[in-house]
């Protein structure tokens, strides 16, 4: 199986118990995955040498559940007003309950039935607020390989009647901001598609999609997550690792609708305590 999209879809409610309630969890005798991918090489889009990624950042991909997360969200007016209304609905649905300002997040990774999902390396991820155990996000992650051999992250979020799937390409951050003194790289995960040099093909597979049954529609949404090891001097000053004691990774996550940025999330990751 090398499906781009998952078969999973939500009912009226998703919630933190989605995989259990839908009997999608893998049997207990199956090894549980630890991260969004098994190896960082599984996301090699053939645009740079992934072996140069800073090892602290690799932990986010390969051992995701071992990290605690602090999020600070900065909503852009008037989306900041609209979000307070939309968030009430999404709390009831139990999906995409992003912070208004700040949240401490716990992440759990599960083995799931890959036949039901339809993707060969799918795994479930549930993120909840540490203080309340309320769900923030429910997702099934896998990888996708296109006809040119480029690999992408395929992140599926069940929603009522279908799902939203982000096909994300792993890039390096260019310039001096993206490399430390030892040549180790910061990275970006992006849904912005592009044409690759020396190829006549149309733009690559990156994007965000609404998926309903066999139908998929490209959404007017884009996101980009830039990640640095906290020790990298090139990280943005706004991502001071002292904000969350023990931080090893910092990140900036921008989300856009029709090209207009509506929110920026700042992330601090540290080993679970």
Positions of predicted regions on the chain:
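Soluble ligand-binding/transfer domains with enclosed cavities or grooves
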Residues: 3-270
């Amino acid at each position: 199986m090398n499906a781009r999209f998952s078969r999973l879809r939500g009912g009226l409610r998703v919630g933190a118990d989605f995989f259990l309630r839908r009997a999608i969890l893998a049997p207990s005798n199956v090894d549980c995955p630890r991260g969004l991918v098994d190896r960082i090489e599984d996301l090699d889009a053939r645009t740079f040498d992934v072996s140069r990624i800073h090892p602290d950042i690799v932990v986010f991909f390969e051992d995701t559940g071992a990290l605690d997360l602090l999020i600070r969200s900065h909503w852009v007016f008037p989306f900041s007003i609209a979000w307070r209304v939309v968030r009430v609905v999404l709390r009831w649905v139990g999906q995409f309950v992003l912070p208004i300002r700040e949240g401490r997040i716990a992440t759990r990774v599960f083995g799931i039935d890959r036949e039901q999902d339809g993707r060969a390396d799918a795994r479930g991820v549930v993120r909840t607020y540490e203080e309340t155990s309320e769900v923030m996000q429910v997702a099934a992650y896998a990888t996708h390989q296109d006809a040119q051999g480029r690999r992408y992250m395929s992140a599926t979020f069940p929603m009522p009647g279908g799902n939203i799937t982000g096909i994300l390409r792993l890039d390096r951050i260019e310039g001096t901001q993206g490399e430390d003194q030892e040549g180790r790289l910061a990275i970006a995960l992006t849904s912005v598609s592009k044409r690759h040099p020396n190829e006549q093909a149309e733009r690559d597979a990156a994007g965000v999609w609404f998926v309903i049954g066999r139908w998929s529609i490209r959404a007017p949404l884009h996101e980009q997550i830039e990640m640095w090891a906290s020790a990298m001097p090139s990280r943005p000053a706004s991502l001071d690792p002292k904000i969350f004691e023990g931080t090893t990774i910092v990140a900036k996550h921008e989300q856009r609708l029709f090209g207009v940025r509506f929110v920026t999330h700042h992330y601090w990751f540290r080993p679970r305590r």
